[in-house]
Amino acid sequence: MTHLFTHINQDGKANMVDVTDKNTTQRQAIAQAYVEMKAETLALILNGQHHKGDVFATARIAGIMAAKKTSDIIPLCHPLALTKVEVELVAEPEFNRVRIQSLCKLSGKTGVEMEALTAASVAALTIYDMCKAIQKDMVITQVKLLEKTGGKSGHFTSQ
């Protein structure tokens, strides 16, 4: 089976996909990321003792803002009128990590996978930024698309 990259034209050059003739559909994407850290770092966050303030609130807002700016930082993404962005952060002390899950929605001609991935990634980067003075060896891991609905390609769920 031949797979063609949609962002490469017949001359092999990168270009933005033309979505003019695509149908407008309800679209949704859910992405995740994890930030692994020492138990002591996670405890500071959860106990509200971090000297920079509320880490989860800051990461949540950063993720939401990033989703809205995705087309500004990823060159071939279309600017989208997102109708919903959620970023949820859940501490998993049994694994010494924070799980981040983002949800993006819209009614449009192109998907919101990149926006959901950007939201989760930037929320994770924000946690790292706020905690790097305490711990520099945190690990951002498992950034991936969990699910997407809508559009010509239909429903996708990560295995």
Curated annotation (Swiss-Prot):
Catalytic activity from the UniProt record: (8S)-3',8-cyclo-7,8-dihydroguanosine 5'-triphosphate = cyclic pyranopterin phosphate + diphosphate
EC id: 4.6.1.17
Instruction: Locate the active site.
Output: 129
Q: Where does substrate bind?
A: 76-78, 114-115
UniProt xrefs under InterPro entries: MoaC, MoaC_bact/euk, MoaC_sf, MoCo_biosynth_MoaA/MoaC, Mopterin_CF_biosynth-C_dom
Give the Gene Ontology MF terms in alphabetical order: cyclic pyranopterin monophosphate synthase activity; GTP 3',8'-cyclase activity
- Pathways involved: Cofactor biosynthesis; molybdopterin biosynthesis
Task: Name a biological process GO annotation.
Answer: Mo-molybdopterin cofactor biosynthetic process
SUPFAM superfamilies (alphabetical): Molybdenum cofactor biosynthesis protein C, MoaC
Q: Which Gene3D superfamilies match?
A: Molybdopterin cofactor biosynthesis C (MoaC) domain (3.30.70.640)
* Domain of life of the source: Bacteria
**Keyword field:** Lyase, Molybdenum cofactor biosynthesis
Which PANTHER family does its entry note? Answer: MOLYBDENUM COFACTOR BIOSYNTHESIS PROTEIN 1, MOLYBDOPTERIN COFACTOR SYNTHESIS PROTEIN A
**Which family is this sequence assigned to?**
Belongs to the MoaC family.
Q: What does this protein do?
A: Catalyzes the conversion of (8S)-3',8-cyclo-7,8-dihydroguanosine 5'-triphosphate to cyclic pyranopterin monophosphate (cPMP).
The subunit structure is: Homohexamer; trimer of dimers.
Q: Write the protein's name.
A: Cyclic pyranopterin monophosphate synthase
Q: Which organism is it from?
A: Psychromonas ingrahamii (strain DSM 17664 / CCUG 51855 / 37)
